[in-house]
């Protein structure tokens, strides 16, 4: 029996454009490393303002955004994405060190599709992508 993963030399998420927004360099680098190994084109931003220009420039397929950031937090960033007619269809995954019901509900209210608690695993990160991206 042939191992399809081994026989397919192209990474499973090749060419998928992902934006990771987090004020933590460690989180940005971790996500970038994990996703790049899967073939994703990864863009990073340090806050919501930085992210908005990168969304316009790169038009990512999916966005991961930290909730607690300076200047423009994750809720505000998600809301701005979801209220823009050009970008509203981009799935937004909230990232937080908090795992409270209120935080999850507030994320849903502003339009996020999913919520991951930090620190996240490779499987959680890839699972969120596979759940929300139809390829």
Specify the residue positions occupied by each region the protein language model found.
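Short hydrophobic/Thr-rich beta-strand motif most characteristic of the beta2 strand and flanking loop
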Residues: 39-46, 54
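Charged docking surfaces used in two-component/phosphorelay signaling
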Residues: 29-37
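Non-catalytic signal-transmission and effector/linker regions of two-component phosphorelay proteins
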Residues: 1-17, 123-135
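Active-site beta3 strand of CheY-like receiver
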Residues: 58-64
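Receiver (REC) domain active-site loop signature in two-component systems and cognate sites
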Residues: 69
């Amino acid at each position: 029996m042939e191992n399809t993963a081994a026989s397919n030399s192209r990474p499973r998420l090749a060419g998928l454009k992902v934006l990771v927004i987090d004020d933590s360099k460690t989180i940005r680098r971790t996500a970038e490393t994990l996703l790049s190994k899967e073939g994703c084109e990864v863009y990073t931003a340090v806050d919501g303002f930085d992210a908005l220009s990168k969304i316009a420039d790169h038009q990512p397929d999916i966005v991961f955004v930290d909730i607690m950031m300076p200047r423009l937090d994750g809720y505000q960033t998600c809301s701005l994405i979801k209220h823009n007619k050009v970008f509203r269809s981009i799935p937004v995954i909230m990232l937080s060190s908090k795992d409270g019901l209120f935080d999850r509900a507030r994320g849903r209210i502003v339009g996020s599709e999913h919520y991951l608690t930090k620190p996240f695993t490779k499987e959680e990160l890839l699972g969120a992508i596979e759940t929300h991206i139809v390829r």
